[in-house]
Amino acid sequence: MSILSLVEDRPTPKEVYNWRIYLLAAVASFTSCMIGYDSAFIGTTISLQSFKDEFNWDAMSTDKQNLISANIVSLYQAGAFFGAFFAYPMGHFWGRRWGLFVAALVFTLGAGLMLGANGDRGLGLIYGGRVLAGLGVGAGSNITPIYISELAPPAIRGRLVGVYELGWQIGGLVGFWICFGVDDTLAPSHKQWIIPFAVQLIPSGLLLLGILFVRESPRWLFLRGRREQAIQNLCWIRQLPVDHIYMIEEIGAIDQSLEQQRSTIGLGFTKPFLAVWSNKRIMYRLFLGSMLFLWQNGSGINAINYYSPTVFKSIGLRGANTSLLTTGIFGVVKTVVTFVWLLWLIDRLGRRLLLMIGAAGGSVCLWIVGAYIKVAKPTERDPDAPLDGGGIAAMFFFYLWTVFYTPSWNGTPWVMNSEMFDPNVRSLAQACAAGSNWLWNFLISRFTPQMFAKMEYGVYFFFASLMILSIVFVFFLIPETKGIPLESMDGLFEYKPIWRAHAKVLAQLREDEERFRTDIEESGYTKSDAQQVERVEQAESVPKA
């Protein structure tokens, strides 16, 4: 087997890798389009001269400008932090499907509220709208990865959850180029800066429409005791009959996992809270998941996403249009590399190796960019002077950092957090993981303007140092999860050393699979047997007169 081969825990029929599973993942990932667009458009929009003129920006002190910029950006993260936790009761009681619908609805209300802002009304509507939009995307960032991971076959689970990350990058790409387009084609006016705010309504509207046609997660239906509908949905998604041996295995694994959860943690709404506080194993995994998002945000990605014009100015680029163009190219690079990660890397190269390679390469690039700024002091040069050779090299290493970071730390923490928890604590665990992402996101975005003002080149050294530390964390604490069924994740955290756990669990799964199929063959199992059992079960379920 090559290092770039798909890892299957058992023989998987080709019907399982069908268009339906990709369509469901794509519709759910309009959530991440909302997030990506918001993270990309806001920093560039508030840098437009038309926005500054509308709100009398130039009359403010530099400190006040930095404070308002930070507030506009960080209120969104604050809302997202709380939205991630509000999503837990929605996902538990209403399901993944309707939870996503409510998240999109709240986001749409927030986006609509922002459209009422102008110079006379002030920034209050933008502040309020950003909080509501944050609540919506925070809830969506909790539910979407869970929904997709619960639908996905193990061998392509990383790829399918990666569609969520792809949606993020497509939304970001649109956000970057919308701002470049309005700056390049429209005269400074209210219309120029309000258009990027209005475009937020497109991905949320598509999600509101699309969610009406998707299927509920079978695993959530099993959890809620709606077994018949769960089996029906699972068969529809897999495109296999209920008596196929693959379906028998999967349903049996889900039943076994739920029975284990019922006898240990319990299946109620409050049971996961008790389990988290009383079970060190679950608490430890929550720590790992939250730390992955600390290292992700510690790479500097959100400082760049939200304040890209400031970042490029620190390297020596001048002019709003030039910064917007460079930011747009940054978005293109991220999107292209995300496709590579999605199609070839995440389920073939695996999670651990990607994280370590990305951190090592990205750290080197940031050290070089920071060293250039320290030595050359590009911000002190003539604003009309073109980039010199050192500046061009710094831009090259910035984009090379993007190539290292994007297929490693951008989406992989979301994939791992969606798959490494037991079914009954998965919603709560994902809420904690998503909440931690938005907490670190908030802290970075809130203080980035002040960091660039005070630290200058030191900002790049700071993020480069954190990327080095993340390598040590991943090597010693994070197991590989590719190709492992959700119901078998516990084993990964029981074997030591952690870097050998994946091979041991996979070998055990294949041994169990071979034994199961041998037992099935020796029992003389046929499809007609399964159909007869199903008919008997249906007959027994009919009420007697």
From Swiss-Prot:
Q: Does the keyword Cell membrane apply?
A: yes
Q: Which UniProt keywords apply?
A: Cell membrane, Membrane, Quinate metabolism, Transmembrane, Transmembrane helix, Transport, Ubl conjugation
Q: Which Gene3D superfamilies match?
A: MFS general substrate transporter like domains
An annotated GO cellular component of this protein is: plasma membrane
Q: Determine the domain of life of the protein's source.
A: Eukaryota
Q: What is the lineage of its organism?
A: Eukaryota, Fungi, Dikarya, Ascomycota, Pezizomycotina
Which Pfam family, any one, appears in the UniProt record?
A: Sugar_tr
Instruction: Give yes or no: UniProt keyword Transport.
Output: yes
Which GO molecular function entries does the Swiss-Prot or TrEMBL record give?
Answer: carbohydrate:proton symporter activity
Chain's role: Integral membrane transporter that imports quinic acid to be catabolized as a carbon source.
Q: What is this protein called?
A: Probable quinate permease
Checking SUPFAM superfamilies in the record gives: MFS general substrate transporter
What the record says about family reads: Belongs to the major facilitator superfamily. Sugar transporter (TC 2.A.1.1) family.
> Could you list which ranges are Extracellular topological domains?
44-66, 119-130, 181-193, 307-325, 374-384, 479-545
Q: Give the membrane topology.
A: Multi-pass membrane protein
Post-translational modification comment from the UniProt entry: Ubiquitinated. Deubiquitinated by creB, probably to control its activity or amount.
